Amino acid sequence: MLPSIDGRIVLRDWKVAGLTREYETTAATFGADGWIIGRISMEPYAGKARVPARRNGAPVPRKDFVAKHDATSYAIAIDPSGKLRWDQSDIDGEHVITVLTESVSDDYLAFLQSKGVSYLFGGKSRIDVAKVLRKLRKSFGIKTLLLEGGGKINGSFLAADLIDELSVLVAPVADGSIGTPSLFDVASRRSPARSLKLLSIEKRSGGIVWLRYMRSR
């Protein structure tokens, strides 16, 4: 992740050279099988295709749909209500998997199948992220995954204690925006705070600091 010094993750008006380059360079060192983000973060990549209404046809079973299981990398979206309008089934060659709840419409499932977009069900009305990770490993062989936001998705993984390592590129920016998403946002009165063990600190170009932690057992 790429937060400001005060933990904000929306890069609006951040005048720091090389942020994207440093992010991509450090992310590549993990050799991950794919990356996972929330619906809002994925919207710029998805497209604006129309979801056609089916006039006839049997109900679409609420079963996982695997369009491709041998991709070299995967782009995964958490999209509980089925709002992303995919133009194609990959992002720069990375096969798209979308994670849904069973409440999505038959029209949307038929649309995803027509586009060749794989989908998994993470629950009936809410996403169980632990269940999703098990399915990703079983159906696609995904063992290492980059969790890349936004704050609510990060928070759901934190609350479920599913983050093995935390890699943070701290930008030399004090953002100060009120109401801006932070690195972890959890909608719960009970804090899911986790203890971490520092692995390394590295100064990168442009005043960026790369912090790496692992969870403390």
Could you tell me what each predicted segment is?
Residues 1-217:
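Enzymes that bind and transform nitrogen-containing heteroaromatic metabolites
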